[in-house]
């Protein structure tokens, strides 16, 4: 009996991320818009989204309550699960040989998505990967090939298979509880306790990089069994260092039937340096991007400036130029790639920006949404607010959430009386029992600011889906927004802070945002400079620090004290607050003008032409090109 369904033929696109069953960030948004495009569905009748069932978390352990397998069971259709006892024989023949070879479990099925169903493949490898310790017999040879061919040298502790007793108990555990033993809550609690008491070693690791390498072989072997049998090809779309090792495996062993595209959504090594600096310097976009600018001018590469050559993510990312096609989500990401490794400058890096979803908003709809949102705000925070600021972002250092408080410190004194009381809603997500250091520091500052009762209140909302369950929608929140804040230190593109643009909001964007150059180009086509656009304010500590003459060489930028950079950052916050107040509409007429100018800019950023004219050409391979099998594997294998 065939292992194929009628819908399972034709060209297939494979995407490995953490978002096979749920949209978490910009990458998931891109996928949703791509999947909804008829031109994409015509080019790729099959889409396979791949994820690990659970993601490694602190101390090299797992959080099984986050299992994506439950998502697929609840919101999709499961054809096969190596985590349960009984499966159709035809699917067992496909997956069990790979599971037994690598000691992993697969969950395979499909779910609804924009434009039609997609296939989903989840991989549970919690029995074979724990921190940097790996119990996968095939991995040493794969690591040796990566080292020989790509210079990738990762600090894995490769051990033999799990003892028979563990494997037997894991079998029983997954048949009863639907997870492998390595994902069992009690196992992970014991592991964390052992680490805290010094009984086990769990050094700080780039868990994503470790996971990426271990995923590559079992996922590739499963793809070989799921790939089209009608002569159609397969394209692996890699967007960051989690998915690049799978592309490398395909370059080594899948050239007959597979092509690879590296469409960089972010570059992790620069991001880490922006967020944490070198040797505890602390977060600074001004330091890193001014060093990068000088490095590119002088022909330097990242590992010549920073000690990153042993970082796993750096070793993985620097070889992405080997893929058949290379693209980037923004010109700033393309610059980061060229700084990462000089070989990215030897071939075209196609910039395909993200699109934007304009929210249909007339003046009456805006006023109605505003009434709903402000009524809720009055009930929740006890005041009749006259100005609404919003920021929706994940709890990550790179989002620069403290900069919102910096701006509010100045707005509190600059806002005219008729604009008070004002409210900033910061919508994010955190674990109440164990908030991150970043979130804990933010809450401390917010509490101190609110205690001063300046007429501007900051509300932290711990619910990423907010306002679900209330009498208004997320689109209503954007319609009601007067000022949308987004002052990230690292932002490969930056969609969130632009969502309210078409609703007439003043959008504060980061100078480091990948979207900035795209917006600047659109403004120029409209006959406006970026600085003159009434709906845009650019928060640019990078340029401000350079203009202030804080440093003039890579060495002096690296040595600059954090306190000096912080003082410059605060001056930027003051300038941003002044620009926001200057742009606030004084009456309904000016409000309508802001709505018109915001919509005019927003509608020129649609997804559809970007997908049709730029992204699909990056992903599609003409038949003659697809059949031109490179000798890469023969030359390097």
Where are these regions (language model features)?
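Catalytic cores of nucleotide-sugar-dependent glycosyltransferases that transfer UDP/GDP/TDP-activated
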Residues: 1-637
């Amino acid at each position: 009996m065939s292992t194929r369904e009628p819908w399972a033929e034709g060209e297939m696109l494979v995407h490995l991320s953490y978002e096979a069953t749920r949209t978490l960030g910009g990458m998931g948004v891109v996928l949703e818009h791509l999947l909804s495009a008829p031109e994409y569905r015509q080019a790729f009748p099959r889409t396979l989204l791949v994820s690990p069932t659970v993601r490694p978390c602190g101390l090299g352990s797992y959080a099984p309550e986050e299992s994506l397998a439950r998502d697929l069971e609840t919101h999709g259709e499961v054809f096969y699960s190596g985590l349960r006892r009984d499966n159709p024989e035809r699917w067992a023949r496909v997956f069990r040989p790979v599971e037994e070879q690598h000691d992993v479990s697969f969950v395979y099925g499909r779910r609804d998505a924009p434009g039609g169903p997609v296939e989903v493949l989840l991989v549970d490898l919690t029995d074979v990967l724990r921190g940097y310790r790996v119990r996968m017999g095939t991995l040493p040879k794969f690591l040796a090939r990566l080292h020989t061919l790509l210079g990738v040298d990762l600090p894995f502790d490769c051990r033999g298979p799990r003892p028979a007793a563990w494997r037997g108990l894991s079998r029983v555990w997954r048949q009863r509880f639907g997870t492998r033993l390595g994902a069992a809550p009690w196992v992970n609690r014991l592991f964390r306790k052992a680490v805290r008491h010094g009984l086990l070693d769990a050094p700080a690791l780039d868990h994503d990089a470790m996971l990426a390498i271990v995923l590559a072989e079992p996922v590739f072997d499963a793809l070989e069994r799921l790939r089209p049998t009608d002569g159609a090809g397969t394209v692996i779309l890699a967007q960051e260092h989690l998915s690049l090792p799978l592309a490398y495996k395909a370059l080594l062993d899948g050239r007959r039937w597979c092509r690879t595209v590296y469409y960089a959504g972010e570059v992790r090594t620069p991001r880490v340096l922006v967020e944490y600096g070198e040797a505890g310097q602390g977060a600074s976009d001004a330091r890193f991007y001014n060093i990068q600018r000088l490095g590119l001018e002088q022909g330097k590469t990242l590992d010549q400036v920073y000690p990153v050559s042993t970082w796993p993510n750096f070793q993985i990312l620097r070889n992405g130029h080997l893929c058949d096609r290379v693209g980037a989500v923004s010109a700033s990401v393309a610059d980061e790639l060229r700084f990462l490794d000089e070989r990215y400058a030897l071939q075209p890096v196609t910039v395909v920006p993200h699109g934007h979803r304009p929210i249909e908003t007339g003046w009456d709809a805006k006023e109605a949404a505003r009434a709903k949102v402000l009524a809720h705000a009055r009930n929740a925070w006890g005041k009749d607010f006259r100005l609404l600021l919003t920021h929706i972002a994940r709890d990550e250092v790179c989002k620069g959430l403290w900069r919102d408080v910096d701006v509010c410190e100045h707005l509190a004194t600059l806002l005219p009386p008729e604009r008070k009381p004002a409210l900033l809603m910061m919508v994010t997500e955190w674990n109440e029992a164990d908030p991150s250091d970043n979130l804990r520091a933010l809450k401390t500052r917010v509490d101190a600011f609110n205690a001063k009762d300046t007429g501007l209140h900051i509300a932290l909302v711990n619910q990423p889906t907010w306002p679900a369950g209330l009498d208004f929608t997320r689109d209503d929140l954007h319609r009601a927004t007067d000022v949308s804040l987004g002052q990230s230190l690292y932002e490969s593109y930056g969609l969130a802070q632009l969502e309210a643009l078409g609703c007439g909001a003043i959008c504060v964007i980061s100078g480091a945002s990948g979207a900035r150059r795209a917006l600047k180009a659109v403004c120029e086509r409209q006959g406006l400079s970026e600085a003159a656009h009434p709906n845009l304010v650019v928060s640019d500590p990078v340029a401000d620090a350079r203009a202030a003459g804080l440093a003039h060489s890579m060495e002096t930028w690296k040595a600059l004290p954090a306190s000096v950079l912080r003082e410059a950052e605060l001056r930027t916050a003051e300038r941003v607050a002044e620009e926001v107040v200057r742009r606030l509409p004084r009456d309904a007429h000016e409000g309508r003008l802001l709505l018109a100018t915001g919509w005019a800019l927003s509608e020129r950023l649609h997804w559809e032409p970007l997908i049709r004219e730029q992204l699909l050409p990056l992903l599609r391979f003409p038949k003659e090109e697809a059949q031109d099998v490179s000798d890469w594997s023969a030359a390097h294998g």
